[in-house]
């Protein structure tokens, strides 16, 4: 149970005195204040107890007893809050989860990049086309994608739309994951379809057959555990817009501590992780599990300072380092971070984000990623942990459940010339359903080789 936001206003707002990167410039501060006041009265989207449960699951990841699968859109869009989109995304994550659980013989913690991922940090504040300069698109929670002045003006009313879109998404996710749709046998049947129709299916056929035998064996023994019928699924997003996140921060009536009830887990991005800035300050005040994206410029000293600021009690499950180095850098840059952090005695979860360091512009002008680069970064991540005797804790991917053509390569090979066919992302290129499942089978093989 959570109590009214008003009691927490001062404790959760210490970030306001510090510089905050990547915040929209709203033309009417009064309108923003009115929206924030309204959001403060809204009910929580998630409960503190669920955040605690995820923290316990992440503790298992940090200790090497579980694996994190975190995935979803680069940026969600308001017009994609449909049952089909959400179901397909969930279906893809559940299929990946089933493969990883079986092949790695390890519990898989399933966290969606979903129900709140409506904002994007950008490298430039403006965009120029044909001599016209407008504010850059920062995600549906801030402004419109269309390139015209009216659409691009940041509008605080969109924060309420983000709340409502997140609420309806979460409602569907909760219904799907507890209402029989996530039944393991159903998920396995979808995987069998994939193996039959995928060009790289032969590789995975043996694994699918093993899972089939295991399920048949259990059925023959008369075992039909309740756990097969539902799935634990958590929501996460980047905590970027601090006005929104702090408006949805509440005091937990059980403990008197602050929780950001906009999602179970939030992370701080590569562009907003300055130690003396507002985002880290905000994250230090809430009890949710926290992720931090670490790019190739991160030093071991910085990593240790994040632990000091965000996990002073050294609590496994509290802090996750999501590493996004690029396939060409991960083997050089990651070892020192892992060594120094491990030597400090902190137990953090190490997760690879093989997407963000591997983006390039195709000749066609599309932003894309090579499936082989994504795979190579995951391989490098596993190699580093194997060499150091530490635990590769999980994978953070941008994916969709639809058959889009945004990343090149994969079993159903997509070529640069195919990108225009279904390039639908609002921001960065995502793995499609088939590429995501390819990745799950390949990661499962890597995990087995550990």
Indicate residue ranges for each PLM-predicted region:
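Short loop/turn segments at strand-loop or loop-helix junctions that form parts
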Residues: 69-74, 111-114, 352-355, 398-400
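Active-site-facing alpha/beta catalytic cores
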Residues: 75-76, 81-326, 369, 377, ...
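Short, well-ordered loop/turn elements at secondary-structure boundaries
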Residues: 63, 262, 285-287, 344-346, ...
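A general structural signal for short secondary-structure junctions and capping/turn motifs
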Residues: 58-61, 99-101, 282-283, 384-388
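N-terminal basic/disordered segments at the start of proteins
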Residues: 2-67
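Short acidic, glycine/serine/threonine-rich loops at helix termini
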Residues: 120-124, 193-196, 332-334, 360-364, ...
């Amino acid at each position: 149970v959570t109590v009214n936001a008003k009691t927490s206003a001062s404790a959760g707002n210490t970030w306001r005195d510090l510089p905050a990167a990547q915040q929209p410039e709203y033309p009417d501060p009064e309108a923003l204040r009115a929206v924030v006041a309204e959001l403060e009265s809204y009910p929580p989207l998630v409960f503190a107890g669920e955040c605690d449960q995820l923290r316990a699951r992440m503790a298992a990841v940090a200790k090497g007893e579980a694996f994190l699968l975190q995935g979803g859109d680069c940026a969600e869009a308001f017009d994609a809050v449909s049952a089909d989109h959400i179901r397909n995304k969930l279906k893809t994550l559940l299929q990946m989860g089933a493969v990883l659980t079986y092949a790695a013989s390890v519990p898989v913690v399933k966290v969606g990049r979903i129900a709140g991922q409506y904002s994007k940090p950008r490298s430039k504040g403006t965009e120029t086309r044909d001599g016209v300069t407008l504010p850059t698109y920062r995600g549906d929670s801030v402004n419109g994608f269309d390139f015209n002045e009216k659409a691009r003006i940041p509008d605080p009313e969109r924060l309420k739309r983000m709340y409502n879109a997140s609420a309806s998404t979460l409602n569907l996710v909760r219904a799907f994951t507890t209402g029989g749709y996530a039944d393991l046998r159903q998920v396995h049947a979808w995987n069998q379809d994939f193996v039959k129709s995928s060009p790289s299916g032969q590789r995975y056929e043996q694994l699918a057959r093993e899972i089939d035998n295991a399920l048949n064996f259990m059925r023959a023994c008369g075992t039909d555990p309740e756990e097969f019928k539902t799935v634990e699924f958590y929501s996460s997003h980047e905590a970027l817009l601090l006005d929104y996140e702090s408006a949805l921060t509440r005091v937990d009536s059980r403990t008197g501590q602050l929780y950001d009830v906009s999602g179970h887990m939030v992370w701080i991005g590569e562009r907003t992780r300055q130690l003396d800035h507002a985002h880290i300050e905000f994250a230090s005040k809430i009890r949710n599990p926290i992720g931090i994206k670490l790019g190739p410029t991160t030093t071991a000293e910085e990593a240790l300072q994040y632990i000091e600021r965000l996990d002073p009690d050294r609590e496994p499950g509290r802090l996750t380092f999501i590493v996004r180095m690029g396939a060409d850098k991960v083997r050089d840059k990651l070892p020192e971070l892992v060594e120094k952090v491990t030597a400090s005695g902190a137990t953090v979860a190490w997760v690879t984000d093989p997407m963000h360091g591997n983006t390039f512009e195709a000749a066609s002008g599309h932003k894309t990623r090579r499936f082989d680069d994504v795979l190579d970064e995951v391989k490098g991540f596993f190699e580093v942990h194997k060499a150091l005797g530490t635990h590769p804790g999980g994978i953070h991917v941008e994916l969709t459940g639809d058959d889009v053509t945004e990343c090149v390569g994969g079993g159903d090979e997509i070529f640069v010339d195919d990108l225009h066919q279904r390039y639908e992302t609002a921001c960065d290129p995502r793995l499609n359903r088939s590429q995501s499942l390819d990745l799950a089978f390949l990661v499962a093989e890597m995990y087995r080789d550990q």
